[in-house]
Amino acid sequence: MNLTLHQPRPSDYEALASWVPDAVACLRWAGPRILFPFPVSELPDLLVVPGGTSYFLAEGCGVPCGFGQHWVIVAGSVHLGRIIVSPAARGKGVGRALCELLIGEAVRCTGANAITLRVYRDNAVAVSLYSSLGFLPVEADSDKEAIFMRVGVNTSIERADSSCA
């Protein structure tokens, strides 16, 4: 499977919207700032994070199959967020590919020496994936619903070679 990251195109947002079936899924994916149902035409603006960059993962034919963002919260560390894989692509290694490419791009673009993310405790598939990529829980920064996870760049996967926004 040939998967690549690219900057968002307007048609990508239509695919992304179809991956979010209800208000609960929307809240868990995007947080409280994006209310369901959301107008697809407003998604590019709704997803803006100051200093952040959005990416779509696409199959060789250009069909979007994943989405993720990165932004800097603390100097020296880059945070990954709003990671989602198309329901049709789940269980096929697409989440791993998305995370590996997103990590590489985030580190390359920011020069960070650590990567962080948050994941719902009950999302066993995602917790397992992130753990397999070297992320470790930071309980001091976690809460009853979500685990804050961190990995150093030297212990993470190899960086992707593509261009920053």
Regions found by a protein language model. Name each.
Residues 2-4:
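Extreme N-terminal starter segment of soluble prokaryotic enzymes
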Residues 7-81, 86-88, 99-109, 140-143, ...:
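Acetyl-CoA-dependent GNAT
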Residues 96, 121-139:
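Conserved active-site alpha-helix within GNAT-family acetyltransferase domains
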Residues 106-118:
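Conserved GNAT acetyl-CoA-binding A-motif
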